[in-house]
Amino acid sequence: MKIHCCVMILVLIAGSILQIPIWKWCVCFCLFGLVMALELVNTAVEAVVDLVTEEYKPLAKLAKDAAAGAVLIAAIMAVFAGVAMFAPEGMRFLQEVIG
């Protein structure tokens, strides 16, 4: 979760520098919320599984892996969406800085 928070701070800084439009801010905040909500669900699933059993059980592993996989998929999709949204402003910024 610390990595997600650090990335969120970097996105906020980049968005401010690039002056992205308001709708892109809205999408960014929705994606932040989605990833963080899934992190909380993942934490809850892991805590409940650990509370129920301390021994290895295939279904417990499946529950933990599925919850972690949901976070991973959401984070990867957020990165793809972020790259697509920031690309035009990023290219414009680079052209102004370089040329």
Where are the regions that the model predicts?
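Hydrophobic alpha-helical transmembrane segments
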Residues: 1-36, 52, 56-58, 71-99
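Amphipathic, hydrophobic secondary-structure cores in small proteins
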Residues: 39-43, 47-62, 66
